[in-house]
């Protein structure tokens, strides 16, 4: 892992298309501004991990589980 020290207003450049700028510092929090291509997904780590976990749970459903859920949901429609 590369560890860098930056001051307010200073920027880190990653490759040709990504720039990370220190926008604000309050106590123990740092606000970062990120410039990147629109098709690049950028997540806070806690959100990224949650999405990964939910995707894994959804992928673990079997065809039988899905059929049961569909049958259950449609049971009261008649």
UniProtKB/Swiss-Prot annotation:
It is found in: Cytoplasm. InterPro entries: CsrA, CsrA_sf. Keywords: Bacterial flagellum biogenesis, Cytoplasm, Repressor, RNA-binding, Translation regulation. Gene3D superfamilies: Translational regulator CsrA. GO terms for molecular function: mRNA 5'-UTR binding. The keyword Repressor applies. It holds the Pfam family CsrA. It comes from the Bacteria. A translational regulator that binds mRNA to regulate translation initiation and/or mRNA stability. Usually binds in the 5'-UTR at or near the Shine-Dalgarno sequence preventing ribosome-binding, thus repressing translation. Its main target seems to be the major flagellin gene, while its function is anatagonized by FliW. Belongs to the CsrA/RsmA family. Homodimer; the beta-strands of each monomer intercalate to form a hydrophobic core, while the alpha-helices form wings that extend away from the core. HAMAP family: CsrA. This is Translational regulator CsrA. It comes from Geobacter metallireducens (strain ATCC 53774 / DSM 7210 / GS-15). The gene is csrA.
């Amino acid at each position: 892992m590369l560890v860098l020290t930056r001051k307010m207003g200073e920027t880190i450049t990653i490759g040709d298309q990504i720039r990370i700028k220190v926008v604000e510092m309050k106590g123990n929090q740092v606000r970062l501004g990120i410039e990147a291509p629109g098709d690049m997904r950028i997540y806070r780590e806690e959100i990224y991990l949650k999405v990964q976990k939910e995707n894994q749970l959804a992928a673990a459903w079997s065809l039988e589980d899905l059929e049961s859920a569909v049958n259950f949901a449609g049971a009261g429609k008649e």
